[in-house]
UniProtKB/Swiss-Prot annotation:
This is Required for respiratory growth protein 1, mitochondrial. Keywords: Glycoprotein, Mitochondrion. Belongs to the RRG1 family. Essential for respiratory growth and required for mitochondrial protein synthesis. Required for vacuolar acidification. The keyword Mitochondrion applies. One of its GO terms (cellular component) is mitochondrion. It is found in: Mitochondrion. It comes from the Eukaryota. N-glycosylated. Glycosylation is important for correct localization of the protein. It comes from Saccharomyces cerevisiae (strain YJM789) (Baker's yeast).
């Protein structure tokens, strides 16, 4: 069975040696940085492309050209090097041109539309389908009628539904800001949720904090799991050494011994509670590390509980966003009343600029 030349040690050694020699000779014999880069790039591509060649004639031809390139460099024949590289460039350009032509052919007559036009088209399509399902429109409708007659009706119906939702929201009264949280490990990260700071308006720092806490919590859990595994091995070592010295087998409830209580004093947490010296030597160092990890976790819990109190304080973020939400509601209510009084009675479906979608856009709805 034919074998790749790259797997033959003598061939691999020869190619790498020649490649290193050429790379050393390029800056010595060629003073143009652009041409140096071009030669190196072409060499790298060709070596990667023909890495798995099995044809002996192809490999032989390429090695001859490689050796000729090195000789041309040493003799300063840069024009001959360009001639050697021309077929490779030509092939690349042809391939790129073919790809472009194929992509253009596949595109056909498809045109890129404006996003607003696409939105209007979807509204019209949904309107026609709905009316056809109810038997209010025929199966075939000419394009002229669709755009000149049905499109204004479809947009008006869509805008009426939007207007109804706006009216209902304003009728429900001013929205209030509230506290929400996301849980990461033991931590509850509290933050203010309101109409002002939802979606893209949400604080980027909050997102960074949540991702950081998620990463740190997972790291803490992984470290505790690793310590539990090491504690089990340490207990086996302690039992074995105690048996060798006193011929006694230690009986220890390891999960209970490693159990951490958040409400006991620090001195009690970290002091060894075992009467066996070998347990103190082997298991207690791991136990102390686990207690430190637990302590760090509970400190973060306390920190976020205090942060919640800070958010709830008078003049804090909750009060600020609540005030801003009410101001936004009052502004929208004023605009809605103004629009209802001055513009809505004079809406005309088929006059652009005086139709309902244009009126809603004008007043920021």
């Amino acid at each position: 069975m034919a074998q790749n030349f790259g797997k033959i040690p003598s061939h691999k050694s020869y190619v790498l040696s020649l490649y290193r020699t050429v790379l050393r000779n390029i800056p010595k014999c060629c003073h143009s940085y652009a041409f140096q880069y071009e030669i190196k790039k072409t060499l790298s591509k060709q070596l990667f492309k023909h890495k798995h060649d099995k044809s002996s004639w192809s490999v032989y031809t390429l090695l001859n050209e490689f050796s000729l390139l090195n000789n041309c460099l040493l003799e300063g024949k840069l024009q001959e090097i360009k001639n050697l590289m021309k077929p490779l460039k030509k092939m690349k350009k042809q391939l790129e041109t073919t790809k472009i032509l194929n992509s253009l052919t596949s595109l056909g007559d498809v045109k890129t539309n404006d996003p607003e036009e696409v939105r209007r088209f979807h509204v019209l399509s949904a309107y026609i389908k709905r009316k056809q399902d109810l038997g209010l429109l025929p199966a075939y409708i000419p394009k002229t009628y669709q755009h000149k007659l049905l499109l204004p009706l479809a947009l008006n119906e869509h805008a009426c539904l939007k207007l109804f939702h706006i009216q209902q929201k304003l009728k429900n009264g001013p929205p209030s800001a509230g506290l929400s949280y996301t849980k990461e490990g033991r931590n509850q990260i509290w933050f203010v949720r309101s109409p002002i700071n939802k979606g893209r308006q949400q604080s980027k720092k909050l997102g960074i904090l949540i991702r950081k806490e998620r990463k740190d919590s997972q790291k803490n859990i992984d470290n505790l799991n690793f310590c539990e595994i090491n504690a089990a091995w340490a207990l086996h070592e302690a039992i074995w050494e105690e048996y060798l010295e006193s011929k006694k087998i230690i009986k220890v409830n390891l999960p209970k011994y490693l159990e951490y209580a958040a409400n006991i004093p620090k001195s009690t947490k970290c002091n060894p509670s075992s009467q066996y010296q070998k347990i103190k030597e082997w298991v207690d160092p791991v136990r102390e590390i686990m207690f430190e990890l637990h302590s760090k976790s509970f400190q973060r819990v306390e920190y976020f509980n205090k942060y919640k109190e800070k958010l709830l304080k008078n003049g804090g973020q909750l009060a600020y966003f609540d005030k801003k939400s009410k101001e936004m509601y009052a502004k929208r209510l004023t605009l809605f009343r103004k629009m209802s009084k001055e513009t809505l009675p004079y809406v005309t479906l088929f006059i652009e600029g005086r139709d309902l979608p244009s009126v809603l856009a004008k007043y920021g709805f």
